[in-house]
Amino acid sequence: MDFVKGNEACFDRNLRAGHLTGSAWVIDQNRSHALLTHHARLGVWVQLGGHVEDDPDMLGAAWREAREESGLINVRPVLDHIFDVDVHEIPANPKEPAHLHYDIRFLFEADREAPLAITAESKSLRWIALDEITEITREESVLRMVRKTVSVARP
């Protein structure tokens, strides 16, 4: 976490070197499905998450993003510590140059039967069986979380 130590403004999305983001890897109660979004701008299937908006509570930021991006009300943390960390490049777009996201990820659980609400940030939102995720994405950071999910004890 040299990036955090070396950048007091690490939460600021205007920090062009990159910034912290918070993500929610949301699984169902059976630990058999994950909720993924087809990201509107990036065009790939990924976990819910986004900018922390100057909120130093990374778990709280990921939790907020999970609720905002899915419409789910009853999203619960499974672990009280970080589930995964990933650093990835966000391509340049008309509003900002290419930059890095230092993504801090937490594990959450939600009811797969609860209604979902798609936001403008998403082309689609779906519960996908863990063993079928490779059919829609080759993103290693997503596949790594699938592998980690298998190691989390069932309820």
Identify what each model region corresponds to:
Residues 25-29, 34-63:
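Glycine-rich active-site/cofactor-binding loop and its immediate structural neighborhood
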